[in-house]
Design a protein with these regions (language model features):
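Membrane helix-loop boundary segments at the extracytoplasmic
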Residues: 2-8, 391-396, 428-456
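Transmembrane signal-anchor hairpin modules in multi-pass inner-membrane enzymes, especially those
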Residues: 1-59, 65-72, 82-106, 132, ...
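Membrane-interface alpha helices of multi-pass inner-membrane proteins
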Residues: 179-193, 436-442
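TM-adjacent membrane-interface loops and short helices in multi-pass inner/ER membrane proteins
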Residues: 147, 327-383, 389, 396-403
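Short aromatic-rich membrane-water interface segments that cap or initiate transmembrane helices
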Residues: 7-11, 62-70, 135-151, 249-260, ...
């Protein structure tokens, strides 16, 4: 999914969810999920709580301003429930080392593809295009996800997984190979200019060091990763043509080839060095615990001193201020070293304001975008609050946040407990990966990028599923739960098919419109409306068809139906005003324009200014 726009599109998520739920249902029906030992109660409780959160999202369709968006969000979280259940089941029957290796290899593959798209841009067609999600600054690396912070955070999640393989004593070759992509990942993080990626990596690595049984080996692997990262950034930093994405120039092309070669050599050197260091480490005695505690104390003191020296109060004030950074030759480093929150403080504040207006049940899933456009204090476009937890609070109220928090806390507690009990570096790496993801979800919209979210949720499920249980609960071996699980899987597939069918019909309608085939456009829009009658998008498409052939009355009627299904969408009111102007109903157009201005003062004022209207 990472390669398909980060799994952002509803149809992409629907395909993945159908596949995941089908595997769950088929596995339950064919008794593939039978484990040798019972599943822990935490591993049973977490998916149930997340499923309750998903049902609360579905229920919010009854009061949300746009049922289509709420339904899409329900299907999105349904995918994550499926991933969590599937991961828990897989953890019972597949060795953790295989699972960690597979996830690490997949993320490393994305990192390599992204790196090559910058240093050798001709390797991947479309790698130099702007994001389909955002109008990206070309200077920031975003291919193939389309969002630089998302890319940086995803590749950062590979660190605890790779470190766990390096710290494992199962295979010397695998341990050395795990060090190979370290400089590539660091290079990607620097080129994305994502401070969130470095924060997620730091939290995930610290979590791994805490959870790992052999902390000296884990610390040594971390030092090796740091050396690889510093070396990669040292090589890239002075090559401004490469950093700024000017790869069509001879200088940029030359710098790309040089950096590709140096980073490759760095990876090989680090891998060989780790192979030798690991062999040496096996022969050396483990330092006494007193040395370990002293080292930990030094690191804590150094961290606290660094925080104090950075003037945290001043940094916090800078974080709250809107960003004024612009594209420049030194943008990447300037942005990495800045303290600006890039509007996050304002986004978070409005999520809290939305909660205060609807404290119990929120305004409904998918409503934050409308609230932000109506109340935003700065001219920043954003569909999301850039915080999973604050957005859940604003959209779904205290009930939604408590359900989400309960699911995550139960799952994380089980994952951490599994890491400590099993003393497995792989389980520690999975738990740390999950901690890093859910930390990042607190300050960026990675939850909406399914390509990243399935990594975090999947790692959480795998660590949680590894938790042993000494109590044979009646549901513990799926004997009773198996038929129910199969039925739930079938039921969960149905809404995914609805989203998929409606999305494909609307995509076909867009293609037909681009080709001037109004008949096909209308038939596809009618099919989308039949599949998803609460979809305002389908009604808007039908209105556009009638408008193209001059049927103003039917177009206005269809637009009214769209407005009833998405009454806080200012664009629908704007289109209605335009149609009524053409119909000569100036009073109606004025009312609709006033409504659009109330729902989005900034954009409507800009459009009126362009049109020369008062």
């Amino acid at each position: 999914m990472s390669y398909t726009n980060g799994g952002f599109d509803p149809t992409t998520r629907a395909y993945a969810a159908i596949a995941a739920w089908w595997l769950i249902g088929a596995g339950a029906a064919l008794t593939l999920w039978t484990a040798r030992s019972p599943i822990s109660r935490l591993a049973l409780a977490a998916p149930i709580l997340l499923a309750l959160y998903t049902l609360w999202i579905l229920l919010s369709m009854s009061w949300a301003p746009d049922g289509e968006r709420a339904f899409q969000q329900f299907n999105e979280v349904s995918l994550y429930v499926a991933v969590l259940v599937l991961a828990i089941a897989l953890a019972r029957i597949v060795p953790a080392s295989w699972l960690v290796g597979g996830i690490a290899l997949a993320i490393a593959g994305i990192a390599v593809i992204s790196f090559l798209s910058r240093v050798l841009p001709s390797t991947f067609s479309g790698s130099t295009q702007q994001s389909e999600i955002l109008s990206a600054l070309g200077v920031r690396l975003s291919f193939p996800l389309g969002y630089w912070n998302g890319l940086g955070i995803e590749v950062a999640l590979a660190f605890p997984l790779l470190l766990s393989i390096m710290a494992s004593r199962r295979s010397r070759i695998a341990s050395a190979l795990a060090a190979l992509p370290l400089p590539v990942i660091a290079a990607d993080m620097y080129l994305t200019s994502s401070r969130g990626a470095f924060a997620a990596a730091g939290v995930a690595i610290v979590a791994f060091l805490v959870l790992a049984a052999n902390r000296w080996t884990a610390l040594s692997a971390t030092v090796a990763a740091a050396i690889a990262g510093v070396a990669a950034v040292y090589v890239i930093r002075p090559r401004h043509a490469l950093v700024s994405g000017q790869m069509a120039t001879p200088l940029g092309d030359h710098q790309g080839h040089v950096v590709a070669l140096v980073v490759l050599v760095t990876g090989v050197v680090i891998a060989l060095a780790w192979l030798g260091a690991a062999e040496l480490g096996r022969r050396l005695p483990t330092p006494p615990s007193l040395v370990g505690w002293a080292t930990a104390a030094v690191l804590v003191v150094a961290t606290v001193a660094g925080i104090v020296a950075s003037h945290p109060v001043r940094r916090f004030e800078e974080f709250k201020a809107p960003s004024h950074l612009t594209g420049s030759a030194n943008f990447v480093e300037q942005h990495l070293l800045s303290s600006s929150g890039s509007g996050r403080w304002q986004l978070w504040s409005e999520a809290v304001s939305q909660f205060r207006a609807h404290p119990l049940n929120g305004e409904g899933a998918g409503s934050y975008d409308f609230w932000w456009l109506q109340h935003r204090p700065i001219p920043l476009f954003s569909q999301y609050a850039h915080s999973l937890y604050l957005e859940a609070l604003g959209e779904l109220g205290i009930v939604g946040l408590l359900l989400l928090a309960a699911a995550l806390l139960v799952a994380l507690a089980g994952a951490v407990r599994a890491a400590f009990l099993l003393r497995s570096p792989e389980v520690a790496g999975l738990a740390a990966c999950a901690i890093g993801f859910f930390f990042a979800a607190g300050y960026d919209w990675v939850w909406q990028l399914a390509g990243i979210a399935v990594v975090g949720v999947g790692a959480l499920g795998l660590a949680l599923g590894a938790l042993p249980s000494s109590r044979a609960a009646p549901w513990g071996r799926f004997d009773i739960a198996r038929p129910a699980l199969a039925l739930v899987a079938v039921a969960a597939i149905v809404p995914q098919v609805v989203v998929l069918a409606a999305g494909l019909h609307l995509q076909n309608a867009s293609v037909a419109a681009a080709n001037g085939n109004l008949r096909r456009e209308k038939s596809e829009a009618l099919a989308a409306k039949a599949v998803e009658p609460w979809s305002s998008t389908a009604y808007l498409r039908l209105a556009q068809v009638d408008l193209d052939v001059g049927k103003l009355g039917p177009a206005r009627s269809l637009l009214e139906s769209a407005i009833r299904r998405s009454h806080d969408n200012w664009e629908l009111w704007w289109y209605a005003a335009q149609i009524d102007v053409r119909r000569g109903d100036i009073l109606a157009a004025k009312r609709e324009l006033d409504e659009a201005r109330k729902l989005d003062p900034n954009d409507v004022a800009g459009l009126l200014s362009q049109a020369g209207a008062p």
